[in-house]
């Protein structure tokens, strides 16, 4: 329960595993999942509970090493300008190597993003002109829909289809037709897929990336859900399926879904292609809005400690 976390404020270093049994009362603790209904005038009927199916927010406490890392930093009473630490980059590289089998990842390939959606738009602004068509699979995460449409991009949907076993699959024939007909040169690929929950198999990603290569389509791969995989499945990073995919793809990650850190804000991109990386970095910096929070940095480092792997 919450009293266990209070021990951290008393100077006692407590190493605990992720707690999936404690029930948190989040009322009055800055949680829209507990206190907000996004439908004007809607109220919870008497005898019913509020179930926030509309937002990806867990009621589990985060891994204790996150709290510990932030508490240690908070005790130093200055929070001025800073640069990302070596430990920040090392934590991400180690996480990607151990969790996803990534090789060759270096600090210069990693860049901070205030959020995955903001990173998606920065990348699209480099890959496209406003008004361009962008390929997405449907059903489509509403965040993509709102972000792309608000920024002047037209979404072309390629619907997923169920195979004979009831598994949602990409329709490669439809994708090719849509790419050609709509002169598409950028696609947003959600892996694992939100909302269907598909963890794509390697051959599926390879086939999609072959299509994108054939028609010179840049790819933004949102892999924010890649840590939450059920047994019997394995996340395959889009950039890992071929050398062309490695250079054609901007990948987006964050600890926010995995460790319930959305309120801290802090995502990151991985871009191997120097031409793409330099332009995305420039685009995301133009407004001076895409700046890291020092506590967010320490939260990521805490999340990516050994306890986080468990």
Summary of predicted features, one role per range:
Residues 1-15:
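Short, Lys/Arg-enriched N-terminal segments with co-localized hydrophobic residues
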Residues 17-115, 122, 304-306:
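N-terminal small-domain helix-loop-helix segment of the aminotransferase-like
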Residues 65, 69, 91, 174, ...:
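Alpha-helical elements of Rossmann-like donor-binding domains used by nucleotide-donor carbohydrate transfer enzymes
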Residues 75, 79-210, 227-228, 235-240, ...:
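Conserved core of the PLP fold type I
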Residues 153, 214-217, 246-247:
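A short helix->loop->beta-strand "cap" motif at the edges of active sites that frequently abuts
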Residues 188, 219-220:
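Walker B beta-strand of ABC/ABC-like P-loop ATPase nucleotide-binding domains
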Residues 223:
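Walker B catalytic acidic pair
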Residues 248-310:
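PLP-dependent aminotransferase class I/II
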């Amino acid at each position: 329960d919450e009293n266990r976390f209070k021990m951290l404020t008393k100077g006692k270093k407590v190493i605990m595993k992720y707690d999936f049994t404690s029930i948190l009362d989040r009322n009055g603790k800055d949680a829209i999942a507990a206190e907000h209904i996004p439908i004007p005038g809607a109220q919870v009927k008497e005898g019913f509970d509020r179930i926030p199916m509309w937002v990806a927010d867990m009621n589990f406490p985060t891994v204790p090493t996150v709290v510990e890392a932030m508490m240690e930093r908070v005790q130093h009473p200055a929070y001025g300008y800073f640069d990302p630490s070596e430990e920040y980059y090392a934590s991400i590289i180690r996480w990607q190597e151990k969790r996803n089998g990534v090789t060759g990842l270096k600090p210069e390939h990693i860049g901070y993003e205030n959020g995955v959606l903001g990173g998606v738009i920065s990348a699209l602004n480099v890959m496209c002109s406003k008004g361009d068509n962008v390929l997405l699979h449907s059903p489509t995460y509403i965040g993509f829909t709102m972000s792309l449409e608000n920024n002047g991009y037209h979404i072309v949907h390629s619907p997923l289809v169920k195979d004979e076993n009831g598994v949602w699959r990409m329709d490669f024939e439809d994708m090719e037709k849509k790419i050609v007909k709509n002169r598409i040169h950028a696609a947003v690929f959600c892996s694992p897929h939100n909302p269907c929950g598909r963890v794509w198999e390697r051959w599926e990603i390879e086939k999609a990336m072959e299509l994108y290569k054939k028609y010179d389509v840049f790819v933004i791969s949102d892999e924010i859900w890649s840590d939450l995989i059920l047994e019997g499945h394995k996340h395959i990073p889009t950039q890992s399926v071929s050398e062309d995919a490695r250079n054609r793809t901007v990948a987006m990650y964050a600890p926010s879904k995995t460790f319930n850190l959305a309120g801290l804000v802090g995502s990151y991109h991985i871009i191997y292609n120097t031409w793409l990386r330099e332009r995305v970095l420039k685009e995301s910096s133009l407004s001076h809005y895409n700046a890291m929070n020092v506590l967010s940095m320490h939260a990521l480092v805490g999340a990516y400690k050994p306890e986080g792997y468990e």
